[in-house]
A protein has these predicted regions:
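N-terminal hydrophobic membrane-entry segments
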Residues: 1-160
Length: 160
């Protein structure tokens, strides 16, 4: 039985958000965050702490030596689920977007129908990592730039 674990980013570097697969970790677990990410600790469904670069000791309700005893009433599963999400902190550049099909507009000056397509490039950097995870991503296992562009595609088309 492990008393302590080390959690670090092991996902695809192109992901905007990656959830570490280990969810049943102890209060002595070490979290290592590299310079290109922030890490958000979620305990019992609550976004608790946002960690920056460095090594951090996580404090969770899971106590290593009595873990088996505590997990007995729940069939071996922890009653205190804990998750760690790694959120990219790098500037995302040249993300292409476009809307499927065309938009038909009536030109009032020349009385003709215009068939217009929309596309472009998107550059951004996540400034509020907690809000990005909670409001845009949710608690998905991973979230990439293609998924983000797909979410914005509908919003862009709605306002054009």
């Amino acid at each position: 039985m492990e008393i302590s674990q080390v959690l670090k980013f092991e996902g695809d570097p192109d992901l905007l958000v990656w959830k570490h697969p280990v969810e049943d970790f102890n209060t002595t677990t070490q979290l290592v965050v590299d310079a290109t990410h922030k890490a958000l600790l979620v305990v019992n469904g609550n976004a608790c702490d946002l960690f920056g670069e460095g090594r951090h000791t996580l404090e969770t309700p899971n106590i290593p030596l009595v873990k088996r005893l505590i997990n007995l009433p729940t069939g071996g599963q922890t009653p205190f689920p804990c998750k760690v999400f790694f959120i990219s902190d790098i500037h995302q550049m040249d993300m292409t977007w476009g809307i499927p099909g065309e938009i038909v507009l009536d030109d009032p000056t020349y009385q003709i129908l215009l068939h217009i397509g929309l596309c472009g490039n998107l550059n951004f950097k996540i400034s509020d990592h907690r809000k990005f995870l909670l409001k845009m991503v949710g608690f998905r296992d991973q979230f990439d730039s293609d998924t983000l562009v797909a979410k914005f595609r509908g919003i862009i088309k709605q306002y054009v």
